[in-house]
From Swiss-Prot:
Residues bound to (2R,3E)-phycocyanobilin 1: C82
Lineage: Bacteria, Bacillati, Cyanobacteriota, Cyanophyceae, Nostocales
Family from the record: Belongs to the phycobiliprotein family.
SUPFAM superfamilies attached to this UniProt entry: Globin-like
Cross-referenced Pfam families: Phycobilisome (PF00502)
UniProt subcellular location: Cellular thylakoid membrane
Induction of its expression: Phycocyanin-1 is expressed at similar levels in green and red light (constitutive phycocyanin). Constitutively transcribed in vegetative cells, not expressed during hormogonia differentiation in red light.
Binding-site residues, (2R,3E)-phycocyanobilin 2: C153
PANTHER family cross-referenced by the UniProt entry: C-PHYCOCYANIN BETA SUBUNIT (PTHR34011:SF7), PHYCOBILISOME 32.1 KDA LINKER POLYPEPTIDE, PHYCOCYANIN-ASSOCIATED, ROD 2-RELATED (PTHR34011)
Positions of modified residues (N4-methylasparagine): N72
Protein name: C-phycocyanin-1 beta subunit
Keyword vocabulary terms for this entry: Antenna complex, Bile pigment, Chromophore, Electron transport, Membrane, Methylation, Photosynthesis, Phycobilisome, Thylakoid, Transport
Amino acid sequence: MLDAFAKVVSQADARGEYLSGSQIDALSALVADGNKRMDVVNRITGNSSTIVANAARSLFAEQPQLIAPGGNAYTSRRMAACLRDMEIILRYVTYAIFAGDASVLDDRCLNGLKETYLALGTPGSSVAVGVQKMKDAALAIAGDTNGITRGDCASLMAEVASYFDKAASAVA
């Protein structure tokens, strides 16, 4: 896993070049937006149980066959595994938000996840719907302007959305 700083330095080093002005400007902007980034991570983390529970509740209301006898989330053990997986995906999304880089999400969460779900007979499309529901909830919570660092958060919210989209497409 490389954070945004290590990634830029590593790429410049591999090319045998100094950091460019545009790279330094991009990293400076990342530092300037650091408080907003921490606010977003804190909000999502502080509401993680609610985000996961509500996303699961909504998913099962839309796809009741998942919790019916024979469904992939039928029995308390399978339901717990489903909620655990949603929680893990959300946790790694917050790591990516904090780092400003999706590599931690890719390397430690998404790599091989689709194949695991296929092997278990878990419908990846249902997992993707659950991730999208977490995305909607997380964006609503993170985008609330009350009590957070002031400033334009449009690009940060787009970045947050992209991590959820990456997770959803990885399992679909």
